[in-house]
């Protein structure tokens, strides 16, 4: 018996139903999505957030690239 009162027979039945619902092809995809959801849930509980630091230099560089691209498109048109 596993923790939570689930026997081996019940676990096999649950896994068979999951296999029938998702199919063998989509099962890895579903597992990946489930794992990502659990990870995001844990991050939310611990208060972690993804914050990307952007330096002013990086922003200026991106703006220059966009301006050059726009100028090039105007010249080509």
Curated annotation (Swiss-Prot):
GO terms for biological process: protein transport by the Tat complex. One of its GO terms (cellular component) is TAT protein transport complex. It is found in: Cell inner membrane. It is a single-pass membrane protein. Disulfide bonds: none annotated. Keywords: Cell inner membrane, Cell membrane, Membrane, Protein transport, Translocation, Transmembrane, Transmembrane helix, Transport. Its main location: membrane. One of its GO terms (molecular function) is protein transmembrane transporter activity. Residues 52-77 are annotated as: Disordered. The chain crosses the membrane at residues 2-22. The keyword Nucleotidyltransferase does not apply. The keyword S-adenosyl-L-methionine does not apply. Belongs to the TatA/E family. Part of the twin-arginine translocation (Tat) system that transports large folded proteins containing a characteristic twin-arginine motif in their signal peptide across membranes. TatA could form the protein-conducting channel of the Tat system. Forms a complex with TatC. This is Sec-independent protein translocase protein TatA 2.
């Amino acid at each position: 018996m596993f923790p939570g009162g689930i026997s081996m027979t019940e676990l096999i039945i649950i896994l068979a139903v999951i296999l029938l619902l998702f199919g063998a092809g989509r099962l890895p995809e579903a597992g990946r999505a489930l794992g990502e959801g659990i990870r995001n849930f844990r991050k939310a509980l611990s208060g972690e957030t993804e914050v990307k630091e952007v330096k002013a230099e990086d922003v200026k560089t991106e703006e220059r690239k966009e301006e050059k691209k726009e100028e090039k498109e105007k010249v080509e048109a």
